[in-house]
Amino acid sequence: MLADLEALVKLESPTEDLQSCRDVIALANEIATRVLGTPAQIREVNGRPVFWWGSDNPEVIVLAHLDTVWPKGSFTPVWQVEGTAARGPGVFDMKAGFLQALYAMKGITEGAALVATTDEETGSATSKEFIKEISAEAKAVLVLEATLNGKV
């Protein structure tokens, strides 16, 4: 899992860089195919890529994002591990959470989907209606984004 996190983090994906967001979704799909045995669907929502793995009509949605707030080059080095802490753009928000969810989906065959957008850091401007639409049809939507200081 740590190697997958390193790969996702090193592929910097600031929201405003659409090609980088496409690239990170493609990498997430490669990881999903290897870990889960089947590829994700790469959907387009208002011109932006969205990762969708799992049921087409899920009762439970695990919602994530793979864009980052950091412009490319904000971290030097881009990836760093010191003791038990990993650092880099998107480690905390929210590439690690995405990977935890992806690995947790192993063995789930129906009723759930892992969905990752690429515009969350700018307020989900292009995916907000899509998120509302898919959420309205689900029984539960879980977001595994980390919080500061143990806040919920």
Where are the language model's segments positioned?
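Acidic/His- and Gly-rich active-site-bordering loop/insert found
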Residues: 1-91, 118
